[in-house]
């Protein structure tokens, strides 16, 4: 006891006054705090309420990250007010000011990412028709059409490609406005309307075989406007965007299928639309895609008869089967499509 009294008398007066509120107990049932301090100011509780509200925002909400950062910013602001006006605590103010700056910068970044992105007026129609239904974002579409894509025009009568002369390795084009006609050795095959790829069969074919030339002639039937991608740069871009790569595979396959049907029915290009055709297997070459009809007969009469077709059901079925046989896919069945 004498030792304990000596220790207490040597302690500072401030410490002795604080010890009055504390009882050091030997039993587990005794409490450490005898007298609790008063409740903090309302601003302190508002800060914690903001933190709690931000943490319980469901992640399924579209803007949940923006709301979370906003509530954290508000909570840090209340803590700074409480530390400056009611506690005079410099350390609390500095820490919360740091947290406020970090959260506010992230908040601004998230709001910037959510800004409405506009598609160019010239490309709105092609975006809404082809890419938006496949959930391609405007931001990704603008990247696709802005970096290595040019908008070009062709006057009526000008040629986009000449058979056996124009290389197929350089570009891929998408027709925005106008009509083009495709012919083989002077024989009309089909038309290409707006919102369709101009050279999709050649693009698919050159994935396997490079150095080929167009086997058909493509001519503007009226004034045309089209998007033109550099083949090499487009390939590199799609390799870095797997989602967009799959979208391109689907759209090109669908476009090739439409062209196949229009070969068998030349009126299809102008009067009908195939909106839900399946994609075609990539093994078909350019010659098989557009010129197989000519390979069925070396005579002009045979080609003309095949292209012309008849109105009877039996002749239509015969021409359709001959069409698929010319492509080298055997009996007519759904198994030929991917």
UniProtKB/Swiss-Prot annotation:
Pfam families in the record: POPDC1-3
Cell location: Lateral cell membrane; Cell junction, Tight junction; Membrane
InterPro entries with a match to the protein in the record: cNMP-bd_dom_sf, POPDC1-3, POPDC1-3_dom, RmlC-like_jellyroll
Glycosylated residues, chain numbering: 21, 29
GO molecular-function term, one example from the UniProt record: structural molecule activity
Main location: membrane
Top-level taxonomic group: Eukaryota
Extracellular side: 1-40, 87-91
Entry keyword set: Cell adhesion, Cell junction, Cell membrane, Developmental protein, Glycoprotein, Membrane, Tight junction, Transmembrane, Transmembrane helix
Keyword Transmembrane in record: yes
Membrane protein topology class: Multi-pass membrane protein
GO BP annotations listed: epithelial cell-cell adhesion; heart development; positive regulation of locomotion; positive regulation of receptor recycling; regulation of cell shape; regulation of GTPase activity; regulation of membrane potential; skeletal muscle tissue development
Side Cytoplasmic, residues: 62-65, 113-338
GO CC, alphabetical: bicellular tight junction; lateral plasma membrane; membrane; plasma membrane; sarcolemma
Membrane spanning residue stretches: 41-61, 66-86, 92-112
Record carries keyword Metal-binding: no
Function, as annotated: Cell adhesion molecule involved in the establishment and/or maintenance of cell integrity. Plays a role in vamp3-mediated vesicular transport and recycling of different receptor molecules. May be involved in the formation and regulation of the tight junction (TJ) paracellular permeability barrier in epithelial cells. May induce primordial adhesive contact and aggregation of epithelial cells in a Ca(2+)-independent manner. May be involved in epithelial movement during corneal sheet formation and regeneration.
Family of the protein in this entry: Belongs to the popeye family.
Protein name: Popeye domain-containing protein 1-B
